[in-house]
Amino acid sequence: VTLPADVKEVFEGWHATDTADAGALADAKRRIEATDAAIANNNLNSKAIPYYYTGKALLGAADWIKGYTDDNYTITGTTRYYSPQFTKYDKDSVGLAYCSDESKAFDKNRKTGKVDKTAVTNKSYVFYNTRMDRNAKGVWQTSMLASVRGSAKCTP
């Protein structure tokens, strides 16, 4: 997965001592990068999306990417991900919650190149709550994903 030069992902504190948690964290990072690469590269058929997503989360990701494509938009800037927290369900499933700071990330019109810069508010911060399940190939796929923009859990 390759991101354009104007799209940056920063992962702060994304370290785990437990092997399973480390694997889930690594695949969550790759899932985020795959989603942004699909949007940035206008690629509705990215093979990385069904690789890192499954179930309802896969449907949600496909809709999210299609929304950008249909509106002729892409992304630009830097998104910071931080405060990852795990909940173990069993050896092959975990909950992963984390925050993102999108205060330096923006939508960009593909046609005009115009960047929609927005003021930094509490809505610039997003709380994510996900479920990840390890498949038969050992890949931690995101099966459920919910987000809350402006959550007090993530705002400074």
Where do the protein language model's features map onto the residues?
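Core segments of small alpha/beta cavity-forming domains
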Residues: T2-T74
